């Protein structure tokens, strides 16, 4: 049967390597002897270690564990401290942001958003420290800082959702809850409240870059796997000496679409598409509720969407944005004098 490398891996077993020499102080902060693990080799490099955390890494883990502990214990308390219910309802449990009445106050009762504030603070500190660690490790190894800036694009979206936009809206209640299904429910309600995010042009761009990232990733991965029988996975060698693998890959794409990327440019395309996904998405979220109250009406005004006729009678204003409260439904009639 022909060798197919979609599922079949070849593991090269060699003596574990400690990595390039760096600053002596940093060398001392590496710990653990590298070992080879066969299961890891099925996913990537089989070597585990040595591990470098350093001061920033340890601090990041410390604050991150505190944040997760706050979320976890609050969720456990919400099911009356039952471990069984905690596991059973984990996907539905949530730590919610402060109530609207607290506005942008930094101090409120713990059960009215105080725990959320503390968890958010520690989680944000943890993420920022981890970013600083990634940046400093790249500098120490003489690398570019592309990975750190890519990570910062994701941090930007996180800060927009939980920090920047709530401040612009004047209330921490606008932030996202900590929870699996609860944050998905928040996303659905957020879109409905502001007239469907699909009409937000920055949301459109974000989805385009997201799908584009997936397409580029699939095209690049498939191309390299297709020419790995010629050594195409050794991309550094292919850059300086293209050889048979790179020539065939380039020729394939010129044949099929008239243009081909290079071994270097495909990674720049992939980096930009991936970075722009959360970057423009964050801009779209930031404009929602602060500049645009209803994206559908905005789209109609700018000839992006048609003005659909109302088919279910007169629309009722959203009480969350207009202050209008619909009248209560009439009480059910009470029938007296009839025995059950």
Spans of features found by a protein language model:
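Juxtamembrane/interface segments at transmembrane-helix termini
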Residues: 72-77, 131-145, 163-176, 211-236, ...
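Cytoplasmic membrane-interface regions of multi-pass membrane proteins
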Residues: 33-43, 76-87, 98-104, 122-148, ...
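Hydrophobic alpha-helical membrane-insertion segments
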Residues: 56-74, 147-168, 208-215, 276-286
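Membrane-interfacial helical/loop segments at transmembrane boundaries in membrane proteins
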Residues: 74-106, 164-197, 236-253, 294-340
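Alpha-helical transmembrane segments
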Residues: 109-117, 199-217
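Alpha-helical transmembrane segments with an aromatic anchor "belt"
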Residues: 108-164, 177
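Loop-to-transmembrane boundary segments
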Residues: 37-60, 140-151, 194-208, 250-283
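N-terminal juxtamembrane cytosolic/stromal segments of multi-pass membrane proteins
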Residues: 1-58, 75, 79-99, 251-254, ...
